[in-house]
Amino acid sequence: MTQKVHNASYAAFALFAIGILPAFSQGTIANSYIQHNLVSDIAGMADFTDSHLVNPWGISESASSPFWISNQGSATATVYNGSGVASATVASVPNGATKQSLTGPTGQVQNSSTGFLLSNGKAASFIFATQDGTISAWNGGTAAGIMVDNSPAGAVYTGLALNAAGPTLYAANFHSGKIDVFDTNFHATTASGGFTDPNLPSGYAPYNIWNLGGKLYVTYALQNSNKNQPVSAAGNGLVDVFDTNGNLLQRLVSNGPLNAPWGVAIAPAGFGAFGGALLVGNFADGTINAFNLTTGSSLGALQTQTGTPIVIPGLWALVFGNGKSGGDPNTLYFTAGIQGQLHGLLGSIAPPAAVTSLSNGASAGAATAIAPGEVVLVNGGTIGPSPSVSGTIPTSGSMATTLSTTTVTFNGTPAPILFASASQTGVVVPYEIAGSSTASVVVSYRGQTAAAFSIPVAASAPGLFTSAETGSGEVVAFNQDGSLNSTSNPAARGSVAVLFATGDGMEDPSGQDGVVNNYIIRAPVLPVSATIGGQTAQVLFAGSAPGLLAGVLQVEVVVPTAASTGAQPVVLTIGSASSSQQSATIVLK
């Protein structure tokens, strides 16, 4: 029975110990941000080099997809995850029938509706606008297909938005000074409100349009004499807010620090000093300014850690990640046509790395103290990559202490890393902290080092692993026959059940950081007891789980015959500390 349990438990632990990723992040309050370059067509300028990324404008993504980027300079669309790793997908975006002096894709949208069908009878996945007046769409293959060609009329499409509820497509026509509207069949239509601002100054035209939270934010820039380029000067910019029928809701921002504004995003609460603000990026001077989302009052420009404004020449799109393949939701991603739009840059902007709390890796509860060898979750912001990266449990040797440039130390000793992500990193507390009253936790990522986070050290801090990876619900337990305990597979009263926990503290022989438990069985130096359904459960064995990483405790108990049937609470006590998971249960029959 024991060997069956050991084999099955390895698969279970791989699912929850490496995969525990509940979201948590909290920004700092200072106006201090760090720019990181992810991809460029110039070698050495960013983490990755891609020759297609020339003057990238628009960014779009679905709820879980990577970033899709419109490269005006190479007439392509390319795909990258939140860390800048490129997909093999490269789609060309064609020119119109009447090729103008300005070509290539600008704005783009991801289509989540069932409309906008292409020739293959399937809905478009991504839709692109171009400076030479076309709208193209893609749902597979190596090239987008032209669905609208207004190049003969001289249209200059510099931005694109979509209302999936219509579905309706909106294109900013910088040349005509209008918002062109298209129905689900790519046919020209009109919006009842007409996107009219009676107080729009002469010479201003829509430079971009964004759908943010169901409202359409239109940025305006001053046209040059040819009505195809913006005039650069401080104050040359406006932001209006419309509903999806083109009715003006408000003039949100007038002039001020705006200078050919194009990128617009609403910052989440976790984005430091400007959480909840409207962020507007200026193409002309490369700054990003924050405004009150309701009143439009200026809140200032995003600054570096030295207090100077962040300046990104040729700045285009601004977008926050989707929390999946498309980056961290508390990190701002941008595109830029650097060096006079002859080259390109995709990058990120985030608050400095910060640790805000620790949690027990099994119970997921906030840790008031940690124990040597405990699996813990380090919570914070900008402390790892997005999307997350999982470590590998070694068959021999030790678990790595650096993962995707993330390191975590406890009183200077590197911790084995289970996974790393932007808002949470899973580690095993080094046994070397034993004897210390407190631990200084320091996270480093991409050369940044977060301020030390101090937490008391306890002799033990037990937590039970649960199937839902939340610290509540059914615990990860195996019945006497080696099968996984569940509602449909309860354990018999009087039988043996096997539980898995962490936080038992020091062991005998001493635990070793990051190693896989082998045939040397290490037992907790503190006494171990358990209750099921409020009844004492005899502990037959408590020690390191063979085949699993040091820090994972296996506890074999006899299910008390006096316990009730159904889901019954389980409490594990090691020394003077008990698991505090009121709703952690095992199912009995």
Segment roles from a protein language model:
Residues 10-23:
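Bacterial N-terminal signal peptides
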Residues 307-309:
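Amide-donor transfer/coupling interface in amidating biosynthetic enzymes
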Residues 17-20, 199, 338:
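Prokaryotic Sec-type signal peptides and long signal-anchor helices
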Residues 26-292, 297-304, 317-323, 327-334, ...:
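A sequence-level detector for low-complexity, Ser/Thr- and acidic-rich stretches
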Residues 312:
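Glycine-rich phosphate-binding loop at the start of an alpha helix
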Residues 1-13:
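Bacterial N-terminal signal peptides that target proteins for export
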